[in-house]
Amino acid sequence: MARKKITLVGAGNIGGTLAHLALIKQLGDVVLFDIAQGMPNGKALDLLQTCPIEGVDFKVRGTNDYKDLENSDVVIVTAGVPRKPGMSRDDLLGINIKVMQTVGEGIKHNCPNAFVICITNPLDIMVNMLQKFSGVPDNKIVGMAGVLDSARFRTFLADELNVSVQQVQAYVMGGHGDTMVPLTKMSNVAGVSLEQLVKEGKLKQERLDAIVSRTRSGGGEIVALLKTGSAYYAPAAAGIQMAESFLKDKKMILPCAAKVKAGMYGLDEDLFVGVPTEISANGVRPIEVEISDKEREQLQVSINAVKDLNKAAAEILAK
């Protein structure tokens, strides 16, 4: 059976980490693409030399040529300008739309049947732009956001309660920004709801509120500490989890920025926004779950924020 081909567009910190994880998990041969001369080739050679140590046997190569995307099974896009201290994800809008246009055309001409995962910020708008320029169908393109945001929520809860993070089930919906919606009603620790933990005095409400707030600003916290870039280990791990669910037909239900159809979650138009999504060999399938009235109101605020950015993106394209 032919090995799968995974192409990573953008060979920076996230791209390089994605490549390493793909090799360790033995998902397939890896192509690292970047516009920087030599850089993807150097990283590919370095990664190739880990194979004897890791005990894996896959091909890794770097390139500056979009033709090398040909016949990719999965394309993960991280290309674009990363956040710097003081910048919001939205500040990247104008710059990264142009990047998505170039990348989208590269996908369209070389691997239109690939499963595409977008990680570039501002996420919900970039995945929309990437679909616009690539022509990839709704079920074959998705944005990585909710997996990462939910992982941050789970991490902070586990740390606060001093329990294994594996016992914490916590979910985040909505746009990948300050209006994201951590679902406190749905989240639990070993089956015990956060609401019950608050009632029992094991988790103070003010601490839960602080964790929700920290989750929303989790990316900015890392940007402020790094000073010269943004998170890359956890975003890469999230992207690989999504790719693996597709490649191995795991049918995992993960919070992702999928194309949600009008009528779901009160939407009056189709929109890329973070919701629980099944990822299988057939692609992505958004799922509607019951949420509280308060969470639905918060989700609407987040949806409106995504719509506003989509309008801003449309205005940029019209110029």
Swiss-Prot record:
InterPro entries: L-lactate/malate_DH (IPR001557), Lactate/malate_DH_C (IPR022383), Lactate/malate_DH_N (IPR001236), Lactate_DH/Glyco_Ohase_4_C (IPR015955), Malate_DH_type3 (IPR011275), NAD(P)-bd_dom_sf (IPR036291). Pfam families: Ldh_1_C (PF02866), Ldh_1_N (PF00056). The keyword NAD applies. CDD domains: LDH-like_MDH (cd01339). It catalyses: (S)-malate + NAD(+) = oxaloacetate + NADH + H(+). NAD(+) binds at G10, A11, G12, N13, I14, G15, D34, N96, I119, T120, N121. GO terms for molecular function: L-lactate dehydrogenase activity; L-malate dehydrogenase (NAD+) activity. Catalyzes the reversible oxidation of malate to oxaloacetate. This is Malate dehydrogenase. It comes from Francisella tularensis subsp. holarctica (strain LVS). The lineage of its organism: Bacteria, Pseudomonadati, Pseudomonadota, Gammaproteobacteria, Thiotrichales.
